């Protein structure tokens, strides 16, 4: 669902995509994956990633997209963004969810992305992600004043 929304953003305003993938991966079973996510959240774990962005200095605008796990982004997203310098960047959070909206993600993004201008976030119901192109496109363009 999140990937679909990220692709809608790219189609609407351009840019590069970077997929956050953990070294160990997550279970494809929903209940097992949920349990893994909960354990990571409760332990404030930062899972190792297959790849990291080293530098975002060439970008002015960063869309941070992810599913809502335990009321915020997956801990793997934090593994990535906590090491980046967001000073002077525009950050647009998007979260796919199944009922929790943006959860605490805006507070977390504000805390982590020091020096950034945090724009209004967008919550997309996961079950409706494939039908959300118009809403995602409108939000992405408005976020960039395009």
Please give the residue ranges for each predicted region.
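N-terminal beta1-alpha1-beta2 submodule of the flavodoxin-like/Rossmannoid cofactor-binding fold
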Residues: 1-64, 71, 78, 82, ...
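Short beta->alpha junction loops/turns
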Residues: 67-70, 98-99
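Short amphipathic alpha-helical segments
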Residues: 75-78, 106-107
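Short, glycine-/small-residue-rich phosphate/pyrophosphate-handling segment
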Residues: 92-131
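Short, conserved loop/helix-junction motifs that constitute active-site signature segments
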Residues: 56, 82-88, 112-113
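Residues at the starts of beta-strands that form the adenosine-phosphate
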Residues: 14-16, 90, 117
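Alpha-helix N-cap/helix-start motif
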Residues: 73-74, 102
